[in-house]
Amino acid sequence: MSSEPFKNVYLLPQTNQLLGLYTIIRNKNTTRPDFIFYSDRIIRLLVEEGLNHLPVQKQIVETDTNENFEGVSFMGKICGVSIVRAGESMEQGLRDCCRSVRIGKILIQRDEETALPKLFYEKLPEDISERYVFLLDPMLATGGSAIMATEVLIKRGVKPERIYFLNLICSKEGIEKYHAAFPEVRIVTGALDRGLDENKYLVPGLGDFGDRYYCV
C-alpha cells in the first residue's frame, strides 16, 4: 500500500513479525551475527515487495496434469545497483530472488563536516538503460547520496519510472527531498523514522548500518 502523502512511497505492512525484526536490529546490544541474520530477513521482504511492482504480462502454461494454468511473466530485464558500502549488504537478498541478476555499484561518500555527498566511483551494466533498476541502500537519511546515485542512473539513460529504491529505514526529510527531485521513482521501505539528529543520523535509527553489518 502506498504511504501518504507520496503516491510512490510504499511502506511494508507493519506486522508484529516486522516490528520484531526491527526491534532486534535497532537494539545496540544485538550481536553482529544476529544483526546480519535479521537484517537479511528484512531485506528479503523489501526485495519481494519491490518485485511486486514490476510490470507483468499474462502467460498460459501447461501443467503435468495436461491442464492450462493462466499466470503472469515479468516484462523486461532487471538489475541491482548498490550504493557502496552499506548497499552491498542488500545484493544477496536480490540474488536470492532473481537468478543471475546483474549488479552494478556506485560509491558515494559523505563529507563528515558538510554532510554533502561526493561521487567517487561507478560501475554499471552497459545495457542498464534497458533494464528496471533496484537501487539498494539500507538508510535514507538526508537523501543526498540517494539523489546523486539516481542522477547517475538517469544520466546513463535509465528512466525514473524504471527505478525502485529499496531501503530499510528512511526519514521524512529524506523522503521529501528525494521525492521532490524524483517523484516518479518508487521507494520501498520498511520503516519511517521521526527525523535526524544534529549529525544527520536517523533517530531512533540503529547507528551506522555498514559498520554493524561489516563489523568495522
From Swiss-Prot:
SUPFAM superfamilies: PRTase-like
Residues bearing PTM Phosphoserine: S82
Example GO BP: pyrimidine-containing compound salvage
Superkingdom assignment: Eukaryota
GO terms, molecular function: GTP binding; uracil phosphoribosyltransferase activity
Keyword Nucleotide-binding: yes
Binding-site positions, D-ribose 5-phosphate: Y201
Cofactor note: Binds 1 Mg(2+) ion per subunit. The magnesium is bound as Mg-PRPP.
Cofactor(s) demanded: Mg(2+)
Gene3D superfamilies named in the record: 3.40.50.2020
Catalytic activity: UMP + diphosphate = 5-phospho-alpha-D-ribose 1-diphosphate + uracil
Keywords assigned by UniProt, alphabetized: Allosteric enzyme, Glycosyltransferase, GTP-binding, Nucleotide-binding, Phosphoprotein, Transferase
Residues that, per the record, bind 5-phospho-alpha-D-ribose 1-diphosphate: R85, R110, D137, P138, M139, L140, A141, T142, G143, G144, S145, D208
Induction, as annotated: Induced by uracil.
InterPro entries: PRibTrfase_dom, PRTase-like
Annotated function: Catalyzes the conversion of uracil and 5-phospho-alpha-D-ribose 1-diphosphate (PRPP) to UMP and diphosphate in the pyrimidine salvage pathway.
Protein family membership: Belongs to the UPRTase family.
Full protein name: Uracil phosphoribosyltransferase
Species the sequence originates in: Saccharomyces cerevisiae (strain ATCC 204508 / S288c) (Baker's yeast)
